Amino acid sequence: VSRDSTRSRVYEAEAMIRRLFDRAGGAHTVQLAGTELTLPPEGRFGSSDDVRSYVERVRRMPAITERFERAVMPVAVRSRRGDRAAHYEREGATIAVPDSADGRWALRETVVLHELAHHLDPLADPPHGPVYLATLVDLVDAVLGPEAALVYRVILGDFGLRLS
């Protein structure tokens, strides 16, 4: 596995993306690169069981199965201890999300899509490299729509991150 040299920048960019979704408010509009965009409401989950159901629905969407070869592979979802991170375990194809009250920040759609993109990434090396980022943006486009995908492209680019 290659060194994951872009991980911290990816996490910083995604923190900014989450803040944009949070700020979009009831009208779901944000200003980005001089353009007003309407973002979809971001799903929030109450438990790892809710995340599991969501991941299965997304994985079986025709737009996902047609685009990503690895979508046919099942994904397990489990609770994890601690509240600082969600993560994906390639061996065992498992998404782990914190289920504690302090870990609720991770029970949101953008975080779950980040972890699901690790599952769908055909290379997984480096873990947050250009192929992964292209997979993530394609997944966001298919699930949340083109406006959300544009937000990802612009902000990832602002952080100097390249998509393949």
Each model region followed by its residue ranges:
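Active-site-proximal or metal-binding-adjacent scaffold patches in catalytic folds
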Residues: 1-110, 119-164
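Walker B catalytic acidic pair
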Residues: 115
